[in-house]
Amino acid sequence: GQWNVDGLWQPQVDGEKISCFYGMFERSDGAKFLENYELGSNATLFSPQGGLRASASDLASILRLLANEGALNGRKILKRSSVETLLSPAWSLNAAGNNGRTSGEAQPGGARDGLMTSYGLSVHRIDMRAWGFVDGPATLLGHVGRAYGVFSFALFDPDSRDGIAMIVTGVADDPFKAPGHSPLTRLEETVLHWWINH
């Protein structure tokens, strides 16, 4: 239907029409994926990208682990070299911009272009100035998550080791129709601006 910023919540996956993301096209046979599904057999079909189900507290623990070079609550869990490998760039967009797609899984040429310009081992390496953030850290490391009406991120400043974990549900049907100054939604930008300024 028509986007209405003040409108009611619109079901995306738990309504009568299931609309899971299986590529950059709308499927008319979305319910077909459920035909052979047995409860409890494999939740992958219903899991977020990457399969991580975590609370904001869990995400904050992961950030503390990475920011503290593999230690959490006084216990060494990962070697420092392992954390360095995770956070180091495995890929970066070249100056010509022709060695990858920066929109992630979104349609190229849209508001999400520039989302990924440097990537570690499943870690976004974000140039905050390129995203239009004039204040705060120049770089953030972490991950942005989306699944079934959930918007989330877990990001930290590698210099100060300060971080933020955010999980928001119940957003309106299409928050991408009013893009901000970055590849994020305005909701995500607003939370980051709040964090930077507090």
Regions found by a protein language model. Name each.
Residues 170-186:
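A short acidic/glycine-rich loop-to-helix N-cap element
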Residues 143, 151-157, 161-175:
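Short, well-ordered beta-strand elements
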Residues 54, 114-117, 147-148, 156-160:
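Extracellular/periplasmic catalytic domains that process cell-envelope and extracellular macromolecules
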Residues 181-197:
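C-terminal accessory segments of extracellular proteins
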Residues 137, 149-152:
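Active-site beta-strand/loop architecture of penicillin-binding DD-peptidases
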Residues 137-144, 182:
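Short intrinsically disordered coil segments
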Residues 68, 72, 92, 169-173, ...:
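Short, well-ordered loop/turn and helix-capping segments at boundaries between secondary-structure elements
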Residues 1-140:
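Short, surface-exposed loop or secondary-structure junction motifs
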